[in-house]
Structure formats: structure tokens, C-alpha cells
């Protein structure tokens, strides 16, 4: 199996997974042309489109792809008006490319957000990013916390295939909270180098995210003051505070 990331709109990722038979699955197609060009170059035949949620930067290529390739579209109920032909829900299993893709419901960024998991890949849309997480446009902080906790239950070698290249910004925020954390500062240097050479930081291994992502694994970090006191409350309360701080963070 081969995984390709297609960068669009400066920081969006479209994911394309294909096998030796040149059949492929397209995840969150935010546009058509880039995908068409890759498929033509590699002689790939799309057999399915996966949608994680309904935002335009993840669905704008769907109708053109359906028309050109006559491809079925799997997605949550919220994506029906954007071309979904097969609605998915928690626990559904999709058998394609001789693999099983399991559906996870991940409310938070949107209420109907889902992810698709087939080891080692987890296509999580805008729920989890490297060193960060998505904004709460529809769901609550509690919703998002438990969605991320669900992702954190996966094996450490899981590869997080997120929808945006926000790693450096996320690390800058994390370092503002933990300025003396050497793991964060060292990884930031690596990310800066990747950014300089226009290389992606994704997919990212879950075991790495457990070291650098304060939203995924807050109890792995030494909080002080008000944040430390929040550790004594329900688990999601600290997550909400961090998300609020991130919303107001100036890069």
C-alpha cells in the first residue's frame, strides 16, 4: 500500500491511498484538479471517496470526482448535500483495497465528524492535528475531548493523517505553555527544517503525538498554577481551558 498527501490551499491535505493494482481511495478531496493530475500521472483508478466532515475545504472536489470517475462517496450524514452516496456511522466497516476501514464517530470540530481507521492509518480530518487539535465549530469541548481520547486508544504505531499542516503553529502554542520542555523545542527545530524544504510533517505517529501534543495527552505534561488546579476537575475541563487559550494565541 502507498500513501500520498496532496497539499492544497496552502495548508490543506488530501490523502490518497493506493495498492499495487493501482486502485485508490481519496480522503477529503478539497479540489479536483490536483487529484486528477496525480491519478493520471500514476495511472490510478479511484474506487471510493471518504469524507470526514462537511467543510468546503474537504468536500469541494467531490462532485467533479463523482462525475469523472463515477466513484461512490462514504461520509457522515452531514455530508449528504455534498455528494455522499453511502452514509457511515460508528462501528461501520468498509472493505476496500483488500483492507478493512473502521468508522469512528468524532464529534467536536463538527457534530457529525468521523474518522476512518485501517492499521496503521487513521484519517482523522480536523479532529486531531500534529501537536494540536481542531477548533470547536459545532461540538463542545467535552465532545472533542472524548473524540481525541478515542484516537489515543489506538496502537502507538498508528499514523495520524490529519487534514491540515498546522504543526509549527501548534508547537509554538505548546512551547508558550511549556517553555522549558526540551522535547517540544527539539521537535520544533525539526519541523522548521521540514517547512523550509516544503516537506510535510504528516502523517505523524501516535507515539510521537503522545510526547508533543498537549491536547492528546495533557497528563504527560507538568502544568502549574491555574492549569494544574484544573487537573483536579473532570478530565475535559483542562482540555477546554487549553483550547480557549489556543483560540486566543497570537502567533
Curated annotation (Swiss-Prot):
- Which residues does Zn(2+) 2 bind? 57-58, 126, 164
- Quote any Pfam family the record assigns: HAGH_C
* Keywords in alphabetical order: Hydrolase, Metal-binding, Zinc
The chemistry this enzyme catalyses reads: an S-(2-hydroxyacyl)glutathione + H2O = a 2-hydroxy carboxylate + glutathione + H(+)
The note on cofactor binding and number reads: Binds 2 Zn(2+) ions per subunit.
Please state the Enzyme Commission number of this protein: 3.1.2.6
- Name a GO molecular-function annotation: hydroxyacylglutathione hydrolase activity
Binding site residues for Zn(2+) 1: 53, 55, 109, 126
Q: Name the cofactor(s).
A: Zn(2+)
Q: State the CDD domains in the record.
A: hydroxyacylglutathione_hydrolase_MBL-fold
Any S-S bridges, and between which cysteines? none
Coiled-coil-forming residues are: none
One GO BP on record is: methylglyoxal catabolic process to D-lactate via S-lactoyl-glutathione
Pathway, per record: Secondary metabolite metabolism; methylglyoxal degradation; (R)-lactate from methylglyoxal: step 2/2
Cited NCBIfam families: GSH_gloB
Q: What does this protein do?
A: Thiolesterase that catalyzes the hydrolysis of S-D-lactoyl-glutathione to form glutathione and D-lactic acid.
Q: How does it assemble?
A: Monomer.
Q: What's this protein's family per the entry?
A: Belongs to the metallo-beta-lactamase superfamily. Glyoxalase II family.
The protein here is known as Hydroxyacylglutathione hydrolase
| Source species taxonomy | Bacteria, Pseudomonadati, Pseudomonadota, Gammaproteobacteria, Enterobacterales
Question: What gene is it encoded by?
Answer: gloB
Amino acid at each position: 500500500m502507498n500513501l500520498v498527501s496532496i497539499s492544497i490551499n496552502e495548508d490543506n491535505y488530501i490523502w490518497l491511498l493506493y495498492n499495487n493494482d493501482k486502485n485508490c481511495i481519496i480522503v477529503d478531496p478539497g479540489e479536483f484538479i490536483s487529484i486528477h493530475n496525480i491519478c493520471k500521472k500514476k495511472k490510478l483508478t479511484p474506487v471510493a471517496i471518504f469524507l470526514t466532515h462537511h467543510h468546503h475545504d474537504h468536500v469541494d472536489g467531490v462532485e467533479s470526482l463523482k462525475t469523472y470517475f463515477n466513484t461512490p462517496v462514504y461520509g457522515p450524514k452531514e455530508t449528504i448535500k455534498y455528494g455522499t452516496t453511502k452514509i457511515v456511522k460508528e462501528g461501520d466497516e468498509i472493505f476496500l483495497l483488500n483492507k478493512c476501514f473502521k468508522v469512528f464517530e468524532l464529534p467536536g470540530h463538527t457534530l457529525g465528524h468521523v474518522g476512518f481507521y485501517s492499521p496503521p492509518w487513521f484519517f482523522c480530518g480536523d479532529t486531531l492535528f500534529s501537536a494540536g487539535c481542531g477548533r470547536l465549530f459545532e461540538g463542545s469541548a467535552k465532545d472533542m475531548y472524548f473524540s481525541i481520547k478515542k484516537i489515543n486508544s489506538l496502537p502507538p504505531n498508528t499514523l495520524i493523517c490529519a487534514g491540515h499542516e498546522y504543526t509549527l503553529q501548534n508547537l509554538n502554542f505548546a512551547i508558550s505553555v511549556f517553555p522549558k520542555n526540551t522535547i517540544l523545542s527539539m521537535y520544533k527545530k525539526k519541523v522548521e527544517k521540514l517547512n523550509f524544504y516544503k516537506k510535510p510533517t504528516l502523517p505523524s505517529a501516535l507515539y510521537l503525538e503522545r510526547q508533543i501534543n498537549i491536547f492528546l495527552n495533557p497528563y504527560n505534561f507538568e502544568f502549574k498554577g491555574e492549569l494544574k488546579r484544573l487537573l483536579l476537575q473532570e478530565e475535559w475541563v483542562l482540555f477546554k481551558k487549553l483550547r480557549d487559550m489556543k483560540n486566543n494565541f497570537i502567533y
